[in-house]
Amino acid sequence: MDIYRENILDHYKNPRNFGRLDKPDVSYEAGNPLCGDVIGMEIKKRQMADGRWQMVDIKFWGEGCAISQASASMLTEKVKGMALEDMKILRYEDIKKMLGIELSPVRMKCALLPLEVLQKAIALV
């Protein structure tokens, strides 16, 4: 098994930032009707000295395949501490690079669900 697949399995079996936040500033949930994956995210933010908003904490919950759950785990690790506006520019290529493997179009929908949830959540801020 290559290192990328091992990393995906590790994030699936031991997800980072899994659970719920106390008093989140925003919460959003969505699903993938093709495979039944469901991901929700909660965000806590604060205003930085320059006036921009920073993500202080993020948690995700849900259930689904190893790809969707690992993608959510990796994504929450990546964005914690980032300015919210910097998260708006994350794209398909970022998720693909983060996972490190080629995915079929159906599996890519699983991998992109957490990014979709994150971007819709920060749009609510």
Language model segments and positions:
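C-terminal binding/interaction regions
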Residues: M1-K23, S27-Y28, R46-Q47, Q54-V56, ...
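Short beta-strand elements
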Residues: N32, D37-Q47
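Short, thiol/selenol-centered motifs that function as redox-active sites or metal-ligating centers
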Residues: C35, E63-S71
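Intrinsic structural disorder/low-complexity segments
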Residues: Q47-D50, A72
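Conserved interaction-surface patches within small, structured recognition/assembly domains
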Residues: I58-W61
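Alpha-helical support elements that line or immediately flank enzyme active sites
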Residues: S71-G81
